Amino acid sequence: EGVRKVCEWIWNGEIGEVRRVDTFTDRPIWPQGLARPEEDMRIPKTMNWDAFIGPAPYRPYNAAYTPWNFRGWWDFGTGALGDMACHILHPVFKGLKLGYPTKVEGSSTLLLNESAPSAQRVKFIFPARDNMPKVAMPEVEVHWYDGGLMPERPAGLPAGKNLNVSGGAAIFYGTKDTLICGCYGKDPYLVSGRVPEAPKVLREITESHQMDWVRACKEDADDRVLSASDFSEAGPFNEMVVMGVLAVRLQGLNQVLEWDGPNMRFTNIPDDAMIKTV
């Protein structure tokens, strides 16, 4: 519901043109910034360790990887950014009708070979998109922070107001107003205090998004109503998210990375480029 409201407010021109978005999460709440454990542990009888390893190179079992902490290890997860951006950046991607970023750069605390860093920031640049009837879609910068790093507080936000809602937030800076929503697009509001009355143009999901997906799966393909986040949207969106992860892992190149989305390649990394990690 929150994602729907964010989209409809932006598309109705309620906050004007958006040229910058700041986002953050309070994650990781699992260990990151770790070296590989040296101790080999007995595999639990209830676990298929080979299935867990999947396509990653084999390593001995250690309780540091499971059941919750896998997401912090590069072989099994994508860290706080990959874990939470799919929830926090969804209203950004959908509301601003984003596609492939053209430029991306990342930085972090100490970057290790084995696990994601303890804190990181990423900057994406997206080109202008087709204008909508009530609002233009100019080039926009999207900034991501995690691990305790935070964006600046928006001007006009009351002192003491906590930006963090359910694990993070997105801050849309428009030419008319500033829109803020929590993780999952939750509880959107305008810094001005005004409550928009935008027309409803997106289908309301009366049940959970999980069951909406099940419904779409069960419907006949000829007259199926697409789910709230169809693969045609979710696929490119997640490509954007892991592009941020890649920017952090390639920060040792010391350059802004230029991305050719349709051909899935960077255009400005020399063939002999080298990066260093610990």
Give names to the regions the model predicted:
Residues 1-48:
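A contiguous active-site-proximal alpha/beta segment in oxidoreductase catalytic domains
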Residues 3, 26, 58, 66-69, ...:
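Active-site-proximal cap/loop segments of hydrolase catalytic domains
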Residues 22-25, 56, 108:
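Residues that line or immediately flank small-molecule/substrate-binding pockets and catalytic motifs
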Residues 30-32, 60-62, 151-154, 181:
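Short, solvent-exposed loop/turn elements at domain surfaces
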Residues 33-36, 68-78:
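Flexible glycine/proline-enriched surface loops and loop-helix/loop-strand junctions
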Residues 79, 90:
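Substrate-binding clefts and catalytic carboxylate motifs of secreted carbohydrate-active enzymes
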Residues 84, 89, 96, 100-278:
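Glycine-enriched catalytic-core subsegment of oxygenase/oxidase enzymes
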